[in-house]
Design a protein with these regions (language model features):
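Venus flytrap/periplasmic-binding-protein-like
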Residues: 36-47, 125, 166-187, 260-269
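Conserved C-terminal helix/tail region of periplasmic/extracytoplasmic solute-binding proteins
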Residues: 267-275, 308-361
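Segments of small-molecule ligand-sensing domains
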Residues: 220-233, 244-317, 323
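Extracellular/periplasmic periplasmic-binding protein-like sensory domains
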Residues: 52, 59, 159-240
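Extracellular/periplasmic Venus flytrap/periplasmic-binding protein
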Residues: 3-6, 44-45, 53-163, 205-208
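Structural recognition of the beta-strand scaffold that forms the well-ordered cores
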Residues: 11-16, 35-40, 55-57, 88-93, ...
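Extracytoplasmic "Venus flytrap"/periplasmic binding protein-like
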Residues: 1-15, 20-39, 48-57, 160-169, ...
Length: 361
């Protein structure tokens, strides 16, 4: 960050693709007036822009993620959300702060919907899960949510099959949804579901446009063209849409040459509705988003995809599903208020039109 922020005239935002790095840069970004971007991840309390004006997490947060997973089980797999009542839900989580973050919220979700939640830890790196899956076999859950990382994900699928649990009832989170998570599991991954904010495949016109204008023109540096349309490649397109449209939003107000504080305003006023996504050719790949002073996530939407091991490809398994924003807000508010108090931060007044429209905070 220190090496790059003033390079070639100065950066106007940073997206480090890391929960740890983006969180570590929160106060540095505030001091330097540098937007820190964490697409689909980051410090959940950072949703509150009145406390974290330079921190943005466009897409979904941890609580969105798990409420959407529960809504998918109810609405799609069971046919009605009311059928969550009485269900047994296990969450297999990575033994880290990231893995543990969803436990309390899952307890809240099951209290709301009348289901039973059991959290089961897998120590890092997760290449041995026999005892955890024996526990799962004994408890006989209706569904298992996989909050995994790295090798833990394919091992979970393989161990589930060995213990007789249907992988079609194993549902992965945002860090358990890539091609690299399922391909190593081989046939054991057949029927596995995972949440995504950017479905895999050539699902939108913008992908074909990139292929035509970049790769066919010999301008790309992607060595393995088979990765076009993969989960992480499409994540790059999703992030690129958010980045570019926020920059354009800032330029529409301030002119073509913008600084980092003005780009902060661009991110905070990023609006992508259906007509905007249609114009970009991104409908189906990118969810609608509406970032505001009090909501630096702005989307709270995701789809699900299911793995076809024979064809080695994902297929879309749902439409956009919204998270339980109302349920998560209390936890987010508590975390943001505590952070503000602990760090002596004066909150912005997001109801004040003049303050909300001020770019140079």
């Amino acid at each position: 960050y220190k090496r790059l922020k003033d390079n070639k005239g100065g950066a106007v935002f940073f997206d480090p693709l890391s929960v740890g790095i983006s969180t570590a840069l929160i106060e540095t970004g505030r001091k330097d007036k540098m937007p820190i971007i964490a697409v689909n991840h980051g410090k959940t309390a950072g949703q509150r822009g009145d406390v974290f004006p330079y921190y943005f997490m466009p897409g979904i947060n941890t609580y969105d993620e798990h409420s959407i997973m529960m809504h998918f089980i109810g609405d799609v797999l069971e046919g009605d959300r009311s059928k969550l009542k009485g269900k047994k839900i296990a969450m297999l989580f990575h033994g880290s702060p990231y893995g543990r973050e969803a436990i309390m919220f899952m307890d809240m979700m099951c209290k709301k919907h009348g289901c039973e939640h059991t959290a089961i830890e897998v120590p890092h790196p997760g290449n041995e899960q026999q005892s955890q899956w024996l526990k799962i076999r004994k408890m006989k859950p209706d569904y298992v949510l996989l909050r995994g990382w790295g090798v833990m994900n394919p091992v979970a699928m393989q161990t589930a099959v060995r213990t007789g649990f249907s992988v079609g009832r194993l549902i992965g989170n945002i860090w358990s949804n890539s091609d690299g998570d399922v391909i190593p599991a081989g046939d054991a991954a057949e029927g596995y579901y995972a949440i995504t904010t950017h479905p895999a495949g050539r699902v939108a016109q913008v992908i074909d446009d990139i292929v035509d204008t970049v790769y066919k023109a010999g301008k790309g540096d992607l060595a393995d063209k088979s990765r076009i349309g993969s989960v992480y490649w499409n994540l790059g397109v999703l992030a690129g849409v958010f980045h570019t449209e926020a920059l354009k939003t800032a330029q529409d107000r301030f002119g073509p040459k913008v600084n980092s504080a003005q780009v902060r305003w661009g991110f905070e006023n990023l609006r992508l509705d259906k007509s905007a996504l249609d114009a970009l050719g991104a409908t189906g790949l990118v969810p609608e988003i509406n970032i505001t002073c009090m909501d630096h996530v702005g989307g709270h939407l995701a789809k699900f995809q299911q793995w076809d091991a024979g064809k080695r490809q994902w297929k879309v398994a749902s439409d956009w599903i919204e998270g339980d924003v109302a349920l998560s807000q209390a936890i987010i508010d508590e975390g943001a208020e505590k952070y503000a108090a602990d760090n002596g931060i004066k909150k912005r007044d997001c109801s004040n039109e003049e303050d909300r429209d001020n770019f140079d905070l």
